[in-house]
């Protein structure tokens, strides 16, 4: 079951059902689907701001591609034998974001929300993460093994100064102190059962 409008679009030999709804209603489903709707209020509020920021960046990116101001992600040649293809929401041409983990998990109202979810959405309404005058592309992963990766190495071939690698249990404000590009060090890290949140 979904809120909002349901629009049907024929694209070639495919029929798309597109759910259109206000951003804040979408976010209630997303933060209830991506994590537990019974999480603490502060965690839900943080997730609402992160998800709202990410969504608005995707919507702007799609609009810029439609207007010809920005191009879609292109493969990056690493060598003659190897290339990297970044799969991003610009792969969507008929809608802003999809309903799966590729974008943000959205399950309509089938995923139960809670009063805390509604309170988190209301308390953070309109709040965004900003870096200078740019809305942050606040992508996230549900698990990182104890060390997050820099944006440019896992999401898109673009440096984002606000999404750097961090160690989960490192003191706040310190840089990662482990070099996981070294195979032996990475293996030791994984086998040590690091604190990962």
Identify the residue ranges that each predicted region occupies.
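Conserved, single-site charged/polar hotspot
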Residues: 1-197
């Amino acid at each position: 079951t979904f809120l909002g409008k349901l629009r049907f679009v024929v694209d070639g030999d495919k029929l798309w059902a597109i759910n259109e709804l206000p951003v804040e209603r979408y976010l209630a489903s997303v933060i209830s689907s991506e994590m537990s709707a019974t999480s603490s209020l502060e965690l839900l509020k943080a997730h609402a701001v992160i998800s709202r920021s990410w969504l608005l960046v995707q919507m702007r990116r799609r609009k810029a591609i439609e207007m010809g101001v920005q191009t879609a992600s292109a493969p990056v040649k690493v060598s003659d034998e190897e290339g990297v293809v970044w799969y991003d929401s610009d792969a969507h041409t008929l809608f802003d974001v999809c309903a799966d983990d590729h974008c943000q998990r959205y399950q309509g109202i089938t995923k139960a929300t809670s009063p805390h979810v509604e309170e988190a959405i209301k308390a953070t309404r309109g709040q965004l993460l900003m870096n200078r005058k740019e809305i942050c592309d606040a992508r996230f992963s549900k698990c990182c093994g104890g060390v997050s990766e820099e944006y440019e190495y896992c999401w898109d071939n673009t440096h984002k100064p606000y999404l750097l690698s961090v160690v989960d249990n490192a003191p706040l404000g310190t840089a990662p102190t482990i070099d996981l590009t070294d195979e032996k060090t990475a293996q030791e890290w994984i086998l040590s059962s690091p604190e990962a949140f």
